[in-house]
A protein has these predicted regions:
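OB-fold and OB-like single-stranded nucleic-acid-recognition modules
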Residues: 1-129
């Protein structure tokens, strides 16, 4: 199901490969719960903030001038593994988003309970659209 506003998620696999933008948008706007209990895999670059670790991408809506970062706050069993990954290094993470965790108060940044993380090569196009 796609929740009306979103394309349906492929249910033929146990893990849904999604863009970080899609995870953020669904967490903020999709009231039908299409991500609830779903294992999701995303690719992004690591951001070590003062009080948190994030996986992020840069989203371009129209042109580079309107580029904005989109990110997931990393929690869960694999959080400690992020110490092995420097800021700006690229990773693939698998886990579940915490329902209703992206709020105006936290800048619409969902919490992502990460089960696994692995280093990957940067994509040929690092942006999301």
């Amino acid at each position: 199901a796609g929740g009306g506003l979103f394309q349906p998620i492929d249910t033929s696999s146990e893990v849904a490969d999604l863009q970080i933008t899609d995870v953020v948008m669904r967490t903020v706007w999709d009231r039908s719960g299409t991500l609830d209990g779903r294992t999701v895999r995303v690719t992004g670059f690591v951001v070590h903030d003062v009080d948190a670790v994030h996986v992020a991408r840069v989203r371009i809506m129209c042109c580079a001038a309107d580029a904005v970062p989109v990110k997931l706050r990393i929690e869960g069993p694999a959080l400690a593994e992020f110490a092995d990954h420097e800021t700006d290094s690229w990773v693939e993470v698998t886990g579940e988003v915490v329902p209703d965790s992206a709020t105006a108060a936290n800048g619409h940044v969902p919490t992502f309970v990460t089960e696994s993380v692995r280093a990957v090569e940067p994509p040929s196009d690092p942006y999301e659209y």
